[in-house]
Amino acid sequence: ASEGNGRGPYVQADLAYAAERITHDYPEQTAPKKAQLSTVSDYFRNIRTHSIHPRVSVGYDFGGWRIAADYARYRKWNNSKYSVSIKELGRNDNSTSNSSHLNIKTQKTEHQENGTFHATSSLGLSAIYDFKLNDKFKPYIGVRVAYGHVKHQVRSVESETTTVTTHNGAPVPQGPTPKPAYHKSRSISSLGFGAVAGVGIDITPKLTLDAGYRYHNWGRLENTRFKTHEASLGVRYRF
């Protein structure tokens, strides 16, 4: 068993695997928001990604209840998407008694999107209760409040090229004609809430192996919501 009934200050270091869920409420192609429509695709509306990052904590064990402050930095999500579509706008079949002249008009639309999302830092405070099953194993649950700083940026560009293909000649392109780019960049600090759970395994009276899970809702960054599910493995040392 731990000396002093487990009471005292402690430090903890963890390596965490975070499943990140990023949801953007960009205007849809329906009224009443049609006038605000952006060219951002669903690819950047609902992002599912992950990262591995270190986390450090300092706290105090009261012999059942623990209070801990933690700090973590997350990996920056950065991605891009290119798409192209071609559609026929019309055709003109100029037929005579001796020949046929077919003109086809097509439109090629190119769409390039680039987006980033970064939870640059998270500073949290947790209240945790340890269930002492025996001298070694201590499952725990708790609640967490955290102050986080997040950044989000997206840029979407479209261009159109119209091509007329004649019966006896090569295709004649007109363009490309770029549309105004859609660009949005935001950075904000917010207060979020979550829950923690896990199990501690005492290796020595002062050293504990910790396997944990935490869920955190970072709140809303204008039209963006950010949530993380994290699994971690670390060690806790009590002084």
From Swiss-Prot:
A GO BP entry: symbiont-mediated suppression of host pro-inflammatory cytokine signaling
Function: Implicated in a number of adherence functions. OPA proteins are implicated in pathogenesis and are subject to phase variation.
Ranges where the record places region Disordered: 90-112, 160-184
UniProt record similarity statement: Belongs to the opacity porin family.
Keyword Membrane assigned: yes
Signal peptide: 1
The protein's name: Opacity protein opA53
